[in-house]
Amino acid sequence: MFYDEKKTYQKIEERLDIIRSFNAHNEHKNLQDEFKGAGISRRDLLKWAGMMSVALALPASFTPLTLKALEVANRLPVIWLHMAECTGCSESLLRSADPTIDSIIFDYINLEYHETIMVASGFQAEKSLHDAIEKHKNNYILMVEGGIPQGTEYFLTQGPNAETGAEECKKAAQYAAAIFAIGTCSSFGGVQAAYPNPSNAQPLHKIIDKPVINVPGCPPSEKNIVGNVLYYLMFGALPKLDAYNRPSWAYGNRIHDLCERRGHFDAGEFVEHFGDENAKRGFCLYKMGCKGPYTFNNCSKLRFNSHTSWPIGAGHGCIGCSEPNFWDTMSPFEEPLANRSIKTAFDGLGADKVADKVGTTLLSATAIGIVAHALLSKAIKNKEQ
């Protein structure tokens, strides 16, 4: 895609200036002071902004705009709903012991409603949600965490009036400017939708009739969450999406293609058992069940825990957590997929049968190719030795 860089820069700058004129929910807060108090230097911040600009597929010259977007983030109202989930996606951002740039930004954003961190409960919480929707009608971002039970809706009721999760989502989505499904449960159903899916848990996009941007992962990295907020702040539009409505800037490449162990895969060098000599040497984890060849995400680039590490870097294979129905299609997690039959809830309660069956067929076909490559590489290596 070709665009005029200068005009795009100017357009984003004008949009951010307009947003700056909006009322801030915490005008007494200075973002620079927040960073300074957490021991984050200007150099660290510039490095982070540069990395986020690259992650969002923006030129390095747009880094000042990324910083500018951060400064007006407290003008952007966010309503965050919890459905059937473990709160792991929120925990990906809510760190108190060692605050990161991402967690500070999350604290700085105009978070109008988030049940994990708000004081209100019961009738007061319900009123807070209603007031936030009315106050920021058509101007807020809706983020939903968790799958939504539909079989017997009373698997999930909330508030003093026992509204179902589906009812709450529909009500909040009606006046949202943009909607994000945060985590695999909200994006694709998650563990709640795993076979046999007794609660008929559904992803958000099957509950509401508005466009949903999926940000899957179990949990997604904090940068993938914050990055989408920044993108919306700068462009006022949805990012380019893949076939599963995931932002291409975050989910456009396979784990396998960007993995630091890829060279070992190509050379036929594999870990045969956890803890063996090959594991100590950092060989490929495919034979230990790594699902990197079938998974699209940017974990190897952005990593987790303040950019410290990621599952493969820590010695365990990818489990494919950002892919649809991964609990069913990617398990057992410590074994290669090969050409096995996959038992899922595809013919059951909540799945898109046609899409899921096609996806399963393609997944099995891909697995055959991966196994063939692995065996051939191993044979060549043994012959050379």
Descriptions of predicted regions:
Residues 84-90, 184, 188, 260, ...:
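Local cysteine-cluster metal-coordination motifs and their immediate loop/turn environment
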Residues 70-75, 83, 90, 101-217, ...:
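Metabolite-binding pocket within alpha/beta catalytic cores that recognizes anionic/polar moieties
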